[in-house]
């Protein structure tokens, strides 16, 4: 199967690197314009040629649009929901006992190693590192929500 796909790709290489059509200079001056050009101009080999051919002409003007993140902006409610979701997925936490104000060690019966694993899961979820000095102070979900909101500048 892979051999057939590779052979098909190799057979298409000459047409992929064939020279592009020659266009009138007037058409090349317009960025990304739709242009009609005469059939006697050169096009890729094997392409059918009607009397007039419609083509997209790339120009020198390029509009760049950067999308840094597809995620919606963070809100306090969104942070709280994500924190509780991650905690509910943790196998040592009973979801019925979990609330925003549950203390990890007193209410949920976790130890310090579990607390470190929770902080690591929060780092993965929110995409930034929580220093050990700050991580030691985060003992309940509400403290984690407040910390993340402070670091991500969410005050809604």
Swiss-Prot record:
Highest rank taxon of the organism? Eukaryota
Record PTM N6-acetyllysine, positions in chain: 88
A Gene Ontology cellular-component term: mitochondrial membrane
Task: Describe, as the record does, how this protein assembles with itself and its partners.
Answer: Mammalian complex I is composed of 45 different subunits. Interacts with ETFRF1. Identified in a complex composed of MALSU1, MIEF1 upstream open reading frame protein and NDUFAB1; within the trimeric complex MIEF1 upstream open reading frame protein functions as a bridging scaffold that interacts with MALSU1 on one side, and with NDUFAB1 on the other side. The complex interacts with the mitochondrial large ribosomal subunit. Interacts with alpha-1-microglobulin chain; this interaction is required for the maintenance of mitochondrial redox homeostasis.
> What are the UniProt keywords, alphabetically?
Acetylation, Electron transport, Fatty acid biosynthesis, Fatty acid metabolism, Lipid biosynthesis, Lipid metabolism, Mitochondrion, Phosphopantetheine, Phosphoprotein, Respiratory chain, Transit peptide, Transport
Transit peptide, from-to: 1-68
Annotated Carrier domain ranges read 77-152
Residues bearing O-(pantetheine 4'-phosphoryl)serine are 112
Described function: Carrier of the growing fatty acid chain in fatty acid biosynthesis. Accessory and non-catalytic subunit of the mitochondrial membrane respiratory chain NADH dehydrogenase (Complex I), which functions in the transfer of electrons from NADH to the respiratory chain. Accessory protein, of the core iron-sulfur cluster (ISC) assembly complex, that regulates, in association with LYRM4, the stability and the cysteine desulfurase activity of NFS1 and participates in the [2Fe-2S] clusters assembly on the scaffolding protein ISCU.
Localization recorded for this chain is: Mitochondrion
Q: What Pfam families does the database record attribute to this sequence?
A: PP-binding
Record's NCBIfam families? acyl_carrier, PRK00982.1-2
* MF terms in GO: acyl binding; acyl carrier activity; fatty acid binding; mitochondrial large ribosomal subunit binding; NADH dehydrogenase (ubiquinone) activity; oxidoreductase activity
This chain belongs to the protein called Acyl carrier protein, mitochondrial
Protein family membership: Belongs to the acyl carrier protein (ACP) family.
Which intervals of the chain form a coiled coil?
none
Query: Biological process GO terms, please?
Result: [2Fe-2S] cluster assembly; fatty acid biosynthetic process; mitochondrial electron transport, NADH to ubiquinone
Q: What is its main location?
A: mitochondrion
Q: How is it modified after translation?
A: Phosphopantetheinylation at Ser-112 is essential for interactions with LYR motif-containing proteins.
Q: Give the matching InterPro entries.
A: ACP, ACP-like_sf, PP-bd_ACP, Ppantetheine_attach_site
Q: Which gene encodes it?
A: NDUFAB1
